Amino acid sequence: MWRLRSTKEQRAQQASFVPTEYNNIALDSEGFFFVTTQTFNSNELTSGAAKPVRRLNAIGTNILIENGTSHVIGDLQWARGDTNITNSGPSKFVDVTVLDNDIYSVMDKTHNRIFTYDKQGNLLWAFGGVGNMDGYFLNPVALEHQGYDLLVLDSQDCCVTVLTPTEYGKLVYKATEQYHAGEYAASADTWREVMKRNGNYDLA
């Protein structure tokens, strides 16, 4: 109504409000919403201005913690500009699931990979890819969890893949949970066990 009564100059000064389109949503243990969106400028990803994953409070403010060495954007490098490469470009998340320990995983549709982060925004691991081998996907459309297991729905394969963590993965979960619970000595011991299995693991 006000726009009808406004002058051309006044309308030009009014900011247009375009709501963000979210393509999936998950509820965490504290009642906050984790959401994913593919509506962003890819040039703003590395600076952190674009937020493809968000944790929203009751008034819609993003309160996702990003204290890791990089932003929560999935792949940190990708082919830019005009390219004929299949599955090129930045990660585009289609779903998110939040475990009871506040660790969350997101499904990337560009490269068919899963990225898992702790509550501080540290990348714990990334895996997957395009293909029909074990651990790879053709067209992942949904991600869910049951305990520590991740369940991926692939619409092209017409199947649900259940991904169970290895002993190494369970140790990473355990060390992360202990650290966030304030059990620093116990967490350090568990991280040492992680280091025995992977001496290049940055968080350990």
Predicted features along the sequence, with ranges:
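Eukaryotic scaffold repeat domains enriched in small/polar residues
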Residues: M1-L203
